[in-house]
């Protein structure tokens, strides 16, 4: 029998226990696959549980000192506040599993064309530190592994979370084989921006028309210029007008059209693509889940994937 065309990395540990008043919407990691299964977009057997990412893979991107600080739960209170989560063995295991999920997706995408991690997109993690709810930079770890194993020669990271992928930009600032492209809120976190290979800062209140026009223009130019043979796509939904921190005016339909542009481009040029969910902080969890589910639905339609 042919292999299933739809590959999704997911583990129940993605939903990590947090204090009740914590602002991170951890529940979404449980609700996204539940909704997609309930509506028939996917089935249980398309969810693949990653193992924990080994030190060997992490150390291709992160420093040994940082990794051992995490293993020994030896970050200061200030460093933990910058990350936004209290360190624990359970949390570090979760982050390893999410990172391995993106690695598994990368190898699946080489075969299937596209693969999804229900979590991931931890683009604020630097080689030697974490911040902004990010501990290991899963895209960077997976990209470095693909390069090391000669599975890709030229990688394009498309970061459409509303916050700049500062950790990713810094990690790859001297790496010619990885091109970092970020469209993000100009006046949003992180307030000190790193230099991506291409940054498109967006004014507060940017609407669908402006956003989608910019994305179409720059993405096509990048495909021609960079000639990527692999894409990592961070499909954050914190660009929505409902988001508590986004500051943009992107509608739900505009968010769908954004995904369509990326997926149609990757599909048309037959470039393997890994998708990770990134951020989303709308007040209603249903809005966040619907926007993330739309990303799956859009890809399923464009790639003609079936459950």
Positions of the model-derived regions?
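N-terminal low-complexity, Ser/Thr- and acidic-residue-enriched intrinsically disordered segments
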Residues: 1-53
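Acidic carboxylate-rich catalytic motifs and surrounding loops in phosphoryl-/glycosyl-chemistry enzymes
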Residues: 44-55, 274-283
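ATP-dependent kinase catalytic cores of phosphoinositide-metabolizing enzymes
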Residues: 41, 74-79
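A general "terminal functional-core" signal
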Residues: 4, 77-307
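Glycine-/proline-rich flexible loop or hinge segments
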Residues: 13-18, 52-56, 78-91
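Charged, often glycine-rich, active-site loop that binds/positions anionic groups
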Residues: 51-75
């Amino acid at each position: 029998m042919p292999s299933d065309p739809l590959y999704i990395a997911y583990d129940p540990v993605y939903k990590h226990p947090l204090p009740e008043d914590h602002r991170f919407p951890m529940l979404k990691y449980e609700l996204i696959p539940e909704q997609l299964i309930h509506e028939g977009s996917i089935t249980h057997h398309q969810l693949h549980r990653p193992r924990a990412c080994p030190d060997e893979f992490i150390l291709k991107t992160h420093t040994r000192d940082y990794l051992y600080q995490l293993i020994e739960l030896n970050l200061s209170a200030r460093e933990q506040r910058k990350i936004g989560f209290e360190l624990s063995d359970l949390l570090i295991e979760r982050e390893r599993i999410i990172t391995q999920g993106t690695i598994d997706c990368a190898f699946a995408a080489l075969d299937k064309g596209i693969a999804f991690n229900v979590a991931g997109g931890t683009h604020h993690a630097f080689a030697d530190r974490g911040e902004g709810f990010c501990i290991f930079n899963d895209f960077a770890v997976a990209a470095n592994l693909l390069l090391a194993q000669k599975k890709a020669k030229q990688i394009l990271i498309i970061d459409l979370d509303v916050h700049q992928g500062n950790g990713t930009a810094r990690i790859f600032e001297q790496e010619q084989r990885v091109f970092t492209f970020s469209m993000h809120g100009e006046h949003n976190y992180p307030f000190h921006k790193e230099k991506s290979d291409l940054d498109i800062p967006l004014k507060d209140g940017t609407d669908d028309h402006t956003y989608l026009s910019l994305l179409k223009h720059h993405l096509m130019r990048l495909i021609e210029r960079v000639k990527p043979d692999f894409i990592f796509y961070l499909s954050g939904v914190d660009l929505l007008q409902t988001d508590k921190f986004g500051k943009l005016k992107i509608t739900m339909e505009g968010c769908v059209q954004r995904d369509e542009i990326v997926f149609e481009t990757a599909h048309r040029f037959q470039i393997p693509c890994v998708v990770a969910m990134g951020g989303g902080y709308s007040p209603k969890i249903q809005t966040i889940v619907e926007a993330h589910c739309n990303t799956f639905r859009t890809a399923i339609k464009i790639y003609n994937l079936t459950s």
